[in-house]
Amino acid sequence: MGSMSVWHWVIVAVVVMLLFGRGKVSELMGDVAKGIKAFKKGMADDETQPNTATSVPPVGPNDPVRTLPHQGAPGTAPQPPHVQPHVSAGDHKAV
């Protein structure tokens, strides 16, 4: 009772054919086939075009070590160093 037999699938197929008609089912299957072909073509195109932006050049044992400058968290601007203002004795104003 848990699995469907061949006769169940035959009845389902006949009901689908009666509801949608032979033309609609064949049109739907053609659209599915076109979608699969387009997907496979897209996958083949991705495999033939290596992503050069993320590729890392090989490093030999005698190559110098390159370091990247430290950057803050994304979206934050670097803060300028805090400098104490210099106030001379003659610059005081009464508030």
Swiss-Prot record:
TM region(s), chain numbering: 1-21
Membrane-topology annotation of the record: Single-pass membrane protein
Pfam families named among the record's database cross-references: TatA_B_E (PF02416)
Region: Disordered, residue numbers: 42-95
UniProt GO cellular component terms: TAT protein transport complex
InterPro entries reported for this sequence: TatA/B/E (IPR003369), TatA/E (IPR006312)
NCBIfam families: PRK00720.1, tatAE
Protein name as catalogued: Sec-independent protein translocase protein TatA
UniProt keyword list: Cell inner membrane, Cell membrane, Membrane, Protein transport, Translocation, Transmembrane, Transmembrane helix, Transport
Molecular function per GO: protein transmembrane transporter activity
Role noted for this protein: Part of the twin-arginine translocation (Tat) system that transports large folded proteins containing a characteristic twin-arginine motif in their signal peptide across membranes. TatA could form the protein-conducting channel of the Tat system.
Subcellular location(s) per record: Cell inner membrane
